[in-house]
Structures are given as C-alpha cells and as structure tokens.
Amino acid sequence: MDFVKLCIDLLLETVGLQHLNLGYKGVVPRHRRAVEEQKVYVCIHEWGGYPPVRQKHINSTICDWECGLKYQLERFENRQDVVLTVTMSDAHRSNDIAEITTRCDHFIAVPNRGMDFSGYGAFYQSIRGLKNCYVLLTNSSVNSLQSDFLDSYIDYMERNTDVGMLGVSCCSKCYQTLVQNNFTPHLQSFFLLTTLDVLTEVVSLNGGQFPGAGICNKQLLIRRGEIRISQLVLQLGYKLAVVTEFGVAKFDNNPKNWTLPYGDFRAYTDKPNAIHPI
C-alpha cells in the first residue's frame, strides 16, 4: 500500500498537481510563543536490532561515521534540565533494555511501522498535555563526537523566535521524486529541536496525525515524514535553522534565501551527523 501511495505521489508531481515544496508566497511570518517550562524534553529513538555502537554508511559521497545509542545516552547524562525518553521499535530484538531504562526517565516500546517517526509520534502523545517547552527529537545515528551544545542551542532559539525548528544537517532537495531540479529545503530528521507549541501546530496542520506515522516504505517516509515536517513548519510562517561547523544558517522556501551547498549537506563535511555548538 505504501508503494502505491508513493507511485501516486510521483505521478501527481510529474503532472504538476502536487508539490513537495509548499511555497513561500502568501505565508505570513510568525514568531514562536515563549516556553513556560524550563525542562527540555528529549526523545531518542532507537531500533532494537542495533548494537550500542555502530558504523553508519549512506553512500560513496558521504563519509562513514561512528554512532550509536551509547553516545546519545552519554550526551544527556547529568543534565538536570533534561527529561529523557527513549523510544524503541522492535524492542524484542534488544538485549540492553534493562540498562537503557536505568539511564533514561521514560522508555516507550513502539512498532517499527514509521521507524523514527513511530517513536517521535508516541513521544509527542506522551507530552502533548504539558505546558509549552523545548522538545528535541533525535535518533542514534547522531555522530559519536561529543560537544556541550544544548545551552547554546536554547540561547539561539530564545534570541531567534522566528525559527520554528533547528537541526544539525539539511538538504536542499527531495531525491525521492521524478522531478530532478526541485528545491525542497528541509532539515534531516535525526535531530530536530523545536517547541511543543510548534509541534502541536504541525500535527494539527497535518490533519491531526504526526508526519510519517504508520509508513513503512523508506522513500515515502522521507517524503511524508522528514520533508513534510520541515515544510509544515515553513507553511506555518516560521523559518528553519541549521547548525554546522560553519555556523548557523536560517532558511525558508524561497530559493533566493538559500546560502548553503545544494543537495545533501553531509556530502560537504567530513563529520556527517555531528552536533556542533554555536
């Protein structure tokens, strides 16, 4: 069924009846509402079949890197301002759940249908009734390189209330389409910092469903999960921001405002998926 949906999407795009890029004309610029809760609610999603430390390979244009849940758990240890949830799909495959549950505040087992977005969606449901707070959605593919980043990211968001979501890597186009020269800017979904208010607006604009929920086909999931969530933030009138080793860049759906390399940013760095402090 997912493959059929993907084919329909591709056909509609080819004839010009559907667009991944939701456009920028007519979008009214907005600013986020201030947070009311000082805690940062973090979700780390993991697949139960992964070892605690692993090597990540994408393709020949992107450097391989070391990553894993071990490094993500270490990243947030001893942070009194963080409430940490680990979500895991196919949890029956893991031999480490007993240890993991001692290193986080909450553990949620989820189906693998939707992959990361299955975990993100379940996590959102668990916190949706809270006061407005900062929310970080991330997974275990983040580079093992450690840095003290969170305070600088929160400070940046506080100073830049026009930013609805912040990431650490991005892409200027959709590769899962027949339209080759498309401009579809989006953050890559292994690290997304936002607020509960913005996330709630995103879900509402997506028909009450968390983007990517229930999708198994990886190409369709990138389109309706990773790309869709960024495009919804932009459609709401916020900007996106990305932190790389070269600094912070804001962007929207206007190609004239794009200042980053075209394509997948990870092809232009020797530290893909790394978190760099501001």
What is the role of each PLM region?
Residues M1-I278:
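ER/Golgi luminal nucleotide-sugar-dependent glycosyltransferases, focusing on the catalytic module
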